[in-house]
Design a protein with these regions (language model features):
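Conserved glycine-rich beta-strand-loop-beta hairpin in the small C-terminal domain of fold type I
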Residues: 122, 138-147, 158-171
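Hydrophobic residues in well-ordered beta-strands that form the structural core
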Residues: 14-15, 45-47, 76, 192-194
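Conserved core segment of the aminotransferase class I/II
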Residues: 68-140, 147-149, 220
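Helix C-cap/helix->beta junction micro-motif
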Residues: 40-41, 153, 188, 229
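A short linear hydrophobic-aromatic micro-motif
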Residues: 74, 154-158, 190-195
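Short hydrophobic/aromatic beta-strand micro-patches
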Residues: 93, 168-170, 207-209
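Active-site pre-lysine segment of PLP-dependent enzymes
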Residues: 1-9, 21-44, 49-84, 97
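PLP-dependent enzyme catalytic core of the Aspartate aminotransferase-like
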Residues: 3, 174-175, 182-192, 198-229
Length: 229
């Protein structure tokens, strides 16, 4: 399908890997196919890789598009994998000339980050194995909680997420997803993101990166809401 859409006029192919909201993961064979399509068209690839270090299976290693393709650019940040969204620090990896141009453009938007933010970011990277290990252990526990809940709900289904902190749930009811989420919040003060935000009605995005007990409580409220529909 991508090959049919890309033409010599295609300047940029944007990827999100691992994917938000589904938690899907594109591994090397698929990425290499996308690179071939981009190279044939002379297109760049921009890959949002903010969840790259939160692959649930430790045996899976996903290459960077910047390593696979001479016109590949990958962005990342401390906000998701390191749970440090408040620092507003990230990075981009790509061809040297492109990164040089990026520095010039960046000077017009962000001259520098705060000294404290910079120091905290450095500390996080110095201790990345500890932080990522803790976060991955939590995610695996929470993913199991979510999977058990989906198995127990006959009107809910999902493709099991392989990475990241979100999953995309399909529900079997005529109620549109925006109304579903508004009513759920009004009734139970529980937040889900409507699938219409991702052009998919009757789907819901759930974030599961927090205390397992709290996740179970929230999912229980969704069950109660489903029962009264």
């Amino acid at each position: 399908e991508l090959a049919a859409l890309v033409t010599p006029r295609t300047k940029l192919i944007c990827l999100n890997n691992p994917n938000n909201p589904t938690g899907a993961l594109m591994e090397r064979p698929l990425l290499e196919r996308i690179v071939r399509i981009a190279r044939d068209a002379g297109s760049w690839i921009l890959c949002d890789g903010v969840y790259r270090f939160l692959v649930h299976d430790p045996k899976v290693r996903v290459p960077s598009v910047a390593d696979l393709y001479e016109r590949g650019v990958v962005t990342g940040s401390l906000s998701k994998c390191f749970s440090l969204a408040g620092l507003r620090i990230g990075w981009a990896v790509g061809p040297e000339a492109f990164i040089g141009d990026l520095f010039s453009h960046r000077d017009y938007t962000t001259i520098s980050c705060g000294r404290l933010d910079d120091r905290l970011g450095c500390l996080a990277l110095e201790h990345r194995e500890t932080i990522l290990g803790r976060n991955l252990a939590l995610l695996r526990r929470c993913a199991s909680v979510l999977e058990r809940w989906v198995d127990s709900e006959p009107r809910v289904s999902m493709v099991k997420p392989r990475a990241g902190t979100t999953a995309f749930l399909h529900y079997d009811h005529h109620l549109d997803s925006q109304t579903f989420c508004r009513r759920l919040y009004d009734r139970d003060r529980t937040l889900l993101v409507p699938g219409t935000c991702f052009d998919r009605d009757r789907w819901l995005r759930v974030g599961y990166a927090f205390a397992p007990d709290d996740l179970e409580t929230g999912l229980g409220r969704v069950s109660g809401f489903l029962r009264q529909l």
